UniProtKB/Swiss-Prot annotation:
It is an enzyme of class 3 (hydrolase). Its main location: virion. This is Nucleoprotein. InterPro entries: Hanta_nucleocap. Residues 1-100 are annotated as: Chaperone activity.
Length: 429
C-alpha cells in the first residue's frame, strides 16, 4: 500500500500532466474554431477525454490520501486517549492544539536570511553588463517596482535587452541579467541580487547617468527629492561654508583661517572613515573604476545626491566611506518616515490603527548600513535636517485634498442625483 508521501508525489505528478492536458485542449479549441472540420473535432474530443481522465485520477488519489490521513488520526486517538501525539515529550496534552508541520529541508543555515551581501561579487557581476540594461532594470525595480515584484514574487527573473549580448563561438546570444524576488520564507545567498541590493549597487555605480535621465523612484519623488537635487552644487557648497556649531569656534580649526565650518567637520569625519575603510570597500571602488563607472568622490560631486534617487535601502558600498554620504541617505529615510507619519495622521481610524501605519525606513536604513561596517554620524544628520528639513517637508506630496468649496459643491450635486434615482443615503465624496 502506498504511503502518504507517495500518494502526494503521485498527485503532484498528475497535476502537472493536467496542466499540460488542459493547454492542449485550449490549443485544440482554437484550431477547431479556425477550421471546424471532422479531424479537428475528433482531436478536441480526444484531448478533452484525456483531461477528464487525469482529473478523475487526481480526485481518486486525493480521496485515498484523505482516507489515509483520517485513518492515521483515528489510530492516534485509539493509541493515546490523552490526545498527545506520538513523539511529543509531554506527559499530558498541552492547552495548545497541534499546528502545522514546518519543513526546514530547504534552509541553509550557513547562509541565513538577512546576512551581509557579498558586495564585491555583486559589483563584479553587474559591471559585466552594459549600462542601458542596468538602467532599464533599475527603472523596472523603482518606477514599476511594485508591479514587477507583485507579478514575479518568489521567483528568479531575467531581464533581457538588445544592448546586452555575448559572443559564444561566433554566435551572438542574449546576456540575461538575473534578479531574485524573494518572498517572506526565502533565504538569499550572499552573492544573490535582490531588488534592494540591485538598487543599492547600481545607484552607487552610475549616479551621473541616473541624474542625466532624471530617474527618480516614486518613493523619493514624494518627499521633495527633486527640490533638493535641482540646485545641488550650489546648495551643498552653501552648506559646507556655513559655520559649524559642532566644532570649537577658533581660527585654528578652519583651513581658511576663519570660523570652523561644516566642511571642516566633514574633513575630520573623512579622516576617521579613512582609518575604518575595509579591504573589500577598496577592492569594490578599484574594480568599479576599472570598469569605467561614474562614481562620486565626495559630497561636493554634482551627482552625489543622485546616489539616493533610486531609493536604495542602505548606503551604496561604493560611497560608504565618503564623509556625509551615508548620513545623507539617513536624512532621506527620516523624510520618508515623516511623510508616512503625516499621511497616517490624516487617515480616519483609531490611534491603534494609525500606530500600525507607522513607518520604519530610518531604522531599516540604519541597521542595514551599519551592518556594512560603519557607524552613522548622527550629528551630521541633524545638520542636514536643520538646513533642509523644512524645505523638504514643504515639498512633500501628500495627495492634495480637494478645495473645500469645490468638495461641498460636488457633494451637493451627488446628493441631489442620488435622491432622484434611489432612496439610499448618498456616499461621501
Amino acid at each position: 500500500m502506498a504511503t502518504m508521501e507517495e500518494l502526494q508525489r503521485e498527485i503532484n505528478a498528475h497535476e502537472g500532466q493536467l496542466v499540460i492536458a488542459r493547454q492542449k485542449v485550449r490549443d485544440a479549441e482554437k484550431q477547431y474554431e479556425k477550421d471546424p472540420d471532422e479531424l479537428n473535432k475528433r482531436t478536441l474530443t480526444d484531448r478533452e477525454g484525456v483531461a477528464v481522465s487525469i482529473q478523475a485520477k487526481i480526485d481518486e488519489l486525493k480521496r485515498q490520501l484523505a482516507d489515509r490521513i483520517a485513518t492515521g488520526k483515528n489510530l492516534g486517538k485509539e493509541q493515546d486517549p490523552t490526545g498527545v501525539e506520538p513523539g511529543d515529550h509531554l506527559k499530558e496534552r498541552s492547552m495548545l492544539s497541534y499546528g502545522n508541520v514546518l519543513d526546514l529541508n530547504h534552509l541553509d543555515i550557513d547562509e541565513p536570511t538577512g546576512q551581509t551581501a557579498d558586495w564585491l561579487s555583486i559589483i563584479v557581476y553587474l559591471t559585466s553588463f552594459v549600462v542601458p540594461i542596468l538602467l532599464k532594470a533599475l527603472y523596472m525595480l523603482t518606477t514599476r517596482g511594485r508591479q514587477t515584484t507583485k507579478d514575479n514574487k518568489g521567483t528568479r527573473i531575467r531581464f533581457k535587452d538588445d544592448s546586452s549580448f555575448e559572443d559564444v563561438n561566433g554566435i551572438r546570444k542574449p546576456k540575461h541579467l538575473y534578479v531574485s524576488l524573494p518572498n517572506a520564507q526565502s533565504s538569499m545567498k550572499a552573492e544573490e541580487i535582490t531588488p534592494g541590493r540591485y538598487r543599492t549597487a547600481v545607484c552607487g555605480l552610475y549616479p551621473a547617468q541616473i541624474k542625466a535621465r532624471q530617474m527618480i523612484s516614486p518613493v523619493m519623488s514624494v518627499i521633495g527629492f527633486l527640490a533638493l537635487a535641482k540646485d545641488w552644487s550650489d546648495r551643498i557648497e552653501q552648506w559646507l561654508i556655513e559655520p559649524c556649531k559642532l566644532l570649537p569656534d577658533t581660527a585654528a580649526v578652519s583651513l581658511l583661517g576663519g570660523p570652523a565650518t561644516n566642511r571642516d567637520y566633514l574633513r575630520q569625519r573623512q579622516v576617521a572613515l579613512g582609518n575604518m575603510e575595509t579591504k573589500e570597500s577598496k577592492a569594490i571602488r578599484q574594480h568599479a573604476e576599472a570598469a569605467g563607472c561614474s562614481m562620486i568622490e565626495d559630497i561636493e560631486s554634482p551627482s552625489s545626491i543622485w546616489v539616493f534617487a533610486g531609493a536604495p535601502d542602505r548606503c551604496p558600498p561604493t560611497c560608504l566611506f565618503i564623509a556625509g554620504i551615508a548620513e545623507l541617505g539617513a536624512f532621506f529615510s527620516i523624510l520618508q518616515d515623516m511623510r508616512n507619519t503625516i499621511m497616517a495622521s490624516k487617515t480616519v481610524g483609531t490611534s491603534e490603527e494609525k500606530l500600525r501605519k507607522k513607518s520604519s525606513f530610518y531604522q531599516s536604513y540604519l541597521r542595514r548600513t551599519q551592518s556594512m561596517g560603519i557607524q552613522l554620524g548622527q550629528r551630521i544628520i541633524v545638520l542636514f535636517m536643520v538646513a533642509w528639513g523644512k524645505e523638504a517637508v514643504d515639498n512633500f506630496h501628500l495627495g492634495d485634498d480637494m478645495d473645500p468649496e469645490l468638495r461641498t459643491l460636488a457633494q451637493s450635486l451627488i446628493d441631489v442625483k442620488v435622491k432622484e434615482i434611489s432612496n439610499q443615503e448618498p456616499l461621501k465624496l
